[in-house]
C-alpha cells in the first residue's frame, strides 16, 4: 500500500515512517509539510491512503481534506494528529469533509508492540480492507403504520458528519419521528460526535445504548465497533455478527434488521460514503414497501455508498443534501 504523509513536524513524520516500515507491504510514497503541497502531491502521485495532520501551515488538514476529496478520484484519508480528544471538533469537521477515521500520532521510540504504533497500523489495515472490498470505489406491500412518525434510518460514512449536521440542523423542532444513525466511526469518537451533532440541531442527539427504544424527536447514534440491530421486541442491541465485514458498525446489518422486526413505517436514507455498505439494506427496505432516499453525486463528499444504491435501484428518491431534511419532514407528516 502506497502511503502519503502530511505533517510539518519532523519527529511525527519519523515516528510514522518507522511504524509503516514494520509492514513490508506498505511504503511511504511521499511526505508533504503543508496543506497546499498535500493537495498537489495527491493529484500528481495519488497514494492509496493519506495520513493527514490537522494543524499545519498555510491551510489546515480540514481544508486539505476538503480539497483532496473534490477530484474525480479522491484519496482515502486517515487523520493522524496529536491529542485527538482535545481536537475532537476538528476531527469531526475533517470527517465531514471526507476523512474516514482518526488516530493519535504514534510516539517516536514506541516499539512494534507499542499501543500508538499498533493503533496506527490497525487503522491502516482497516481502511485497506475497505478499499479492497467488492464494489469499493478507489476511490411488495407497505408496512403497517406505528403510532408515532416513521422511523428514520440513516447510514453514512466518509463525509457523513457534515451531511448529518446539515440534515438534523434543518429538521423542525417538533419533528415527531425517531431517528437512528449508523455512521462509520470509531467507538472512541462516537460519544463526542453525538455531542457535536446535538449542538447542530434542535432535536436531542445521543449515543444508542443496549436496550434503547427509538423515541420520537430523538436521534440515536450507533456507538460501538459492533453492529447495531433492532430486535423483535423493538429495542436496540449490539452484536459482533456478522464478523466478516469491513464495515463496523454496518449500515446493511441495521437496515436488514428493520425489514425483519420493525412493525411500523421506515424511511431509509443513505448518505455520502466510500464503498457500498447500506446499498443492499436500502434495497431490502424498498422491496418491503418503505420509502428510501440516497444522496446525489453532486453533494456527496464521496459518491460510493449512494452510487451503489442508485445502481441497485434501491433509492426511490435521489436528492441533493439540501433537500433531504425537507423531504423527511414532509414524509413524517403523512
Swiss-Prot record:
Belongs to the CheB family. GO terms for biological process: chemotaxis. It comes from the Bacteria. This is Protein-glutamate methylesterase/protein-glutamine glutaminase 2. Residues 134-334 form the CheB-type methylesterase domain. Its EC number is 3.1.1.61, 3.5.1.44. The modification 4-aspartylphosphate is found at residue 53. Residues 2-120 form the Response regulatory domain. Keywords: Chemotaxis, Cytoplasm, Hydrolase, Phosphoprotein. Phosphorylated by CheA. Phosphorylation of the N-terminal regulatory domain activates the methylesterase activity. InterPro entries: CheB-like, CheB_C, CheY-like_superfamily, Sig_transdc_resp-reg_Me-estase, Sig_transdc_resp-reg_receiver. The active site is at 157, 184, 277. It is found in: Cytoplasm. It catalyses: [protein]-L-glutamate 5-O-methyl ester + H2O = L-glutamyl-[protein] + methanol + H(+); L-glutaminyl-[protein] + H2O = L-glutamyl-[protein] + NH4(+). Involved in chemotaxis. Part of a chemotaxis signal transduction system that modulates chemotaxis in response to various stimuli. Catalyzes the demethylation of specific methylglutamate residues introduced into the chemoreceptors (methyl-accepting chemotaxis proteins or MCP) by CheR. Also mediates the irreversible deamidation of specific glutamine residues to glutamic acid. NCBIfam families: PRK12555.1. GO terms for molecular function: phosphorelay response regulator activity; protein-glutamate methylesterase activity; protein-glutamine glutaminase activity.
Amino acid at each position: 500500500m502506497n502511503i502519503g504523509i502530511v505533517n510539518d513536524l519532523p519527529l511525527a513524520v519519523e515516528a510514522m515512517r518507522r511504524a509503516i516500515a514494520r509492514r513490508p507491504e506498505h511504503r511511504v510514497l511521499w511526505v508533504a509539510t503543508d496543506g497546499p503541497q498535500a493537495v498537489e502531491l495527491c493529484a500528481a502521485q495519488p497514494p492509496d491512503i493519506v495520513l493527514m495532520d490537522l494543524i499545519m501551515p498555510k491551510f489546515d488538514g480540514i481544508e486539505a481534506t476538503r480539497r483532496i476529496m473534490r477530484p474525480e478520484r479522491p484519496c482515502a484519508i486517515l487523520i493522524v494528529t496529536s491529542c485527538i480528544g482535545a481536537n475532537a471538533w476538528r476531527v469531526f469537521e475533517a470527517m465531514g469533509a471526507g476523512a474516514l477515521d482518526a488516530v493519535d500520532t504514534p510516539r517516536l521510540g514506541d516499539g512494534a508492540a507499542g499501543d500508538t504504533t499498533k493503533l496506527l497500523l490497525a487503522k491502516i489495515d482497516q481502511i485497506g480492507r475497505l478499499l479492497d472490498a467488492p464494489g469499493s470505489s478507489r476511490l411488495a406491500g407497505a408496512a403497517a403504520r406505528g403510532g408515532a412518525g416513521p422511523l428514520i434510518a440513516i447510514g453514512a460514512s466518509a463525509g457523513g458528519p457534515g451531511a448529518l449536521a446539515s440534515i438534523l440542523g434543518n429538521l423542525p423542532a417538533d419533528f415527531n419521528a425517531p431517528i437512528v444513525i449508523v455512521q462509520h466511526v470509531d467507538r472512541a469518537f462516537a460519544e463526542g460526535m453525538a455531542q457535536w451533532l446535538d449542538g447542530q440541531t434542535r432535536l436531542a442527539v445521543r449515543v444508542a445504548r443496549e436496550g434503547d427504544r427509538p423515541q420520537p424527536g430523538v436521534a440515536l447514534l450507533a456507538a460501538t465497533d459492533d453492529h447495531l440491530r433492532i430486535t423483535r421486541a423493538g429495542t436496540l442491541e449490539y452484536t459482533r455478527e456478522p464478523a466478516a465485514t469491513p464495515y463496523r458498525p454496518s449500515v446493511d446489518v441495521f437496515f436488514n434488521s428493520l425489514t425483519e422486526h420493525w412493525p411500523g413505517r421506515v424511511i431509509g436514507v443513505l448518505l455520502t460514503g466510500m464503498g457500498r455498505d447500506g446499498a443492499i439494506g436500502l434495497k431490502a427496505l424498498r422491496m418491503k414497501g418503505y420509502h428510501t432516499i440516497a444522496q446525489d453525486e453532486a453533494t456527496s463528499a464521496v459518491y460510493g455508498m449512494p452510487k451503489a444504491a442508485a445502481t441497485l435501484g434501491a433509492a426511490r428518491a435521489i436528492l441533493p443534501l439540501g433537500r433531504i431534511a425537507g423531504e423527511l419532514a414532509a414524509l413524517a407528516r403523512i
